[in-house]
């Protein structure tokens, strides 16, 4: 049994990598009835549509990204929430800026690997 009821992927803007990662996890780990899988952004001033390239990639894989970006807030954290980021800088930023932050890991750290994941935003399809 999973100890988390919420899994979040946190990126800068929540318009590309995070929502795509959440959609992939929901697709391959169909726990959406018991575990909330979503994404948030560190700098979301107002809801933005998804990056068109990301929507195209998702669509090609049979995934749907029909949402707008959401800002990370204190209420997103808790002992039942697992939060993933791409690199140590974002992880440290979360711990610096959110007093309720707990269970924040880089994806590689969570699987006991060193390093960060390079954000592919702006790259070729």
Residue ranges and their predicted role:
Residues 1-79:
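Conserved active-site segments centered on acidic
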Residues 85-86:
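Short beta-strand scaffold positions
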Residues 92-125:
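Phosphate-binding/catalytic loops
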